[in-house]
Amino acid sequence: EGITYMKSRAVAGDLERATRFLNRVQDVDWRRWGQSGRSRPQLAQMRLRLEKEQGAADPLTAGRGGYYDIDFALMFLRLKGAGIFFPVLNTPARIDVIEQMGHLDRSDADFLRDAATFYRAVDHGLRVSTGHAEGSLPTSDAQLETLAALVRRWTPDHLHNQPLDIELAPIQARTREFFNRLFGL
């Protein structure tokens, strides 16, 4: 519920008035969910349920250490600071704002930006190369090389120094370590 309210955006009419209203909604959201910490166990449960139900079929997104670990962590951190209205929703911008608020230290923020960039590049590369969303890396060497070439276009050099499967494993492990630390698991 709190997360849904935070995703609201002014799109028509008096944008200034709508933005003031959304600021007030997020202040209420913060008092109800962020300040009390009530969202922490609920978000952890939701995330682990998604992993159990979808993780095997979609390990890059829903699996252990997948993109959802980042997304749910950012949702929790955003709820902690929900009194501040976020004019943008993209992941790198959310990480930047949460870091500036003091809810992420520099090394965690840098890692989350890299991990999110890597996951999104792999996801987009899979969509471009196969024509649809895939939940895991391809098993064919030719498809894996095509995907790797696409990922190299969209990521900084340090995120594609090794084959994708070798690059992925430590990102997943560190993503889950961050998630567990944040949620006290």
Where are these regions (language model features)?
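A nucleotide- and high-energy phosphate-metabolite-utilizing enzyme signature
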Residues: 1-185
